A protein has these predicted regions:
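Alpha/beta catalytic barrel-like cores
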Residues: 1-132, 200, 230, 242-251, ...
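Conserved anion-binding
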Residues: 137-193, 197
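Catalytic beta/alpha-barrel core
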Residues: 65-68, 116-123, 129-135, 179-186, ...
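Active-site pocket-lining/capping segments in soluble small-molecule metabolic enzymes
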Residues: 179-189, 235-240, 244, 249-252, ...
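Alpha-helical scaffolding segments of alpha/beta enzyme cores, especially the outer helices
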Residues: 45, 108, 138-149, 189-193, ...
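Conserved, mostly hydrophobic/aromatic
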Residues: 12, 157-158, 204, 263
Length: 310
């Protein structure tokens, strides 16, 4: 069984479901068909932004989308036809414990679209609830085994390590101190525990890190035990562009980081302005494309520095 994906990977993620519904549109509860169509139409604008970026020079073979089946089925089909890399989430939206969106039918829904990547978002703090971590690991192993034994789709693992209450209390509530001093170590430990539990990610989707040495430790852990082809990408976490740029430049200079997945920082503001009718749809598409392309340029320029200094 070959594990890993190590080609360039520049993902525009817009698989947000619960947060998109409530924070972008202000809707709660069961959606009407008309509301569902409005969300799908907004996601189409994001997708067209990616296409615009490719038309303006982003290499298509490096570009990919991450979008959900609920609001993006048509986008997933079109992107596959257009030969973009695609990713589709398997997790239930907006809950702390990982479980499958479609329960025992998860495999059927993966095979329905055959995305390049099946993505999971998992909150896993090694110093948190041990029983919860074990339950999550057992479900994730089911998915990992299915993908590697029976599917063409690869496993993209988005690892979030939120601070436990006690951890923050030790730092007097300083979340920045947690991100800098505590989270990197816990991320390494989480990857090790998941690997030991039989979860084999092809790509680790990682929260931003401020220090090069922490990026290097993540890659070393992802690669251990003969997993040399496993890739790592940086996620944006909805931060401001300057912070995302800092994380991206730090990661790009470390061999083993193959790209990024930046979503809200790219599309959120243009969609808000478009929905308030302050700009046209075409202008929103263009702005999303320009923002996405700017992050491609940032990553590639930083990586060029790495190669130049090697």
């Amino acid at each position: 069984m070959t594990i890993g994906f190590n080609a360039d990977l520049y993902i525009l993620p817009f698989d947000h479901r619960g947060s998109f519904q409530t924070k972008m549109f202000g809707w709660t509860g069961t959606l009407t068909p008309e509301q569902t169509a409005q969300i799908a139409a907004a996601k189409q604008v994001i997708y067209e932004g990616l296409k615009a970026a490719v038309s303006s020079g982003v290499p298509q073979e490096k570009a990919g989308i991450l979008v959900d089946e609920q609001f993006g089925a048509a986008i997933l089909r079109d992107a596959a036809k257009e030969e973009f890399m695609t990713a589709c989430p398997a997790e239930k939206s907006a809950q702390d414990e990982f479980d499958f969106e479609f329960g025992k039918d998860f495999a059927e829904h993966i095979e329905k679209f055959n995305p390049t990547f099946c993505k999971v978002l998992v909150r896993y703090n090694p110093e948190g609830d041990r029983a919860l971590n074990q339950r999550q690991t057992a479900r994730l192993k089911l998915l990992s085994d299915f993908l590697h034994d029976n599917s063409r789709s690869l496993l993209m693992f988005e690892l979030l390590v939120p601070a436990e209450k006690e951890q923050l209390e030790r730092l007097k509530g300083d979340k920045n101190a947690y991100d800098l001093e505590i989270r990197p170590r816990l991320m390494v430990q989480a990857i090790q525990e998941l690997q030991d539990g039989g979860v084999e990610a092809d790509v680790w989707k990682i929260e931003g890190l401020d220090r090069t040495e922490d990026c290097e430790k993540i890659v070393a852990t992802a690669h251990q035990g003969g997993r040399d082809k496993v890739g790592c990408i940086i996620l944006g976490r909805g931060e401001d562009p300057q912070k995302v740029r800092q994380w991206m430049e730090t990661a790009a200079r470390v061999t083993g980081f193959i790209g990024f997945a930046v979503g809200r920082t790219v599309f959120w503001d243009p969609l808000i302005v478009w929905r308030s009718q302050r700009i046209t749809r075409d202008a929103a598409v263009a702005e999303i494309g320009e923002r996405y392309r700017s992050f491609v340029d940032i990553f590639e320029n930083a990586r060029h520095w790495r190669k130049k200094s090697a």
